[in-house]
Amino acid sequence: MTKTRVEAVKAARVWCLAALLAFAGLAHAELVGPVVAIQDGDTIDVLVNRQPVRVRLAQIDAPEKRQAFGTRSRQALAELVFRQSVRVAETGRDRYGRVIGTVYLGNVDVNAQMVREGMAWVYRQYAKDRGLYELERQAQASSGGLWVDPEPVSPWEYRRDKRERSLAAKRQAQ
């Protein structure tokens, strides 16, 4: 081989390696393990390599623990996945370091199932799956789960109102 051809082959290998590494960074992990804890209606702990990994169900937002339907939502998620082996298709991490992902129990999309049962809202700020909106509409139309309340408060509104009340109380205390 000529010197020029050897250099061209080396350059091609470098480019291939760089491309491979770039695409590897885009791939997300898949976690598999039993669910060992249910934090609330959209957060679970999955045991992976003997370590609990906190997983936030992507694209949905369940009622907060102290919010109406918070306990029921947590219970519904527990009935679906507690002590079951699940697969998590990771889509990223949140600011708290939790894995964000879609949880599967066999072929069942647990995130979608929570919306279908009226146990969670579509998290509009982050949702990309348009099918979730239709599931939410159907749950609402059938008054399923939290939609039994004619005017349910979304978790993001609940959190905002709680922050505002807290700030008002701090200002009043000064």
Language-model features: where?
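Small beta-barrel nucleic-acid-binding modules, primarily SNase/OB-fold domains
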Residues: T2-V6, R13-C16, F23-Q174
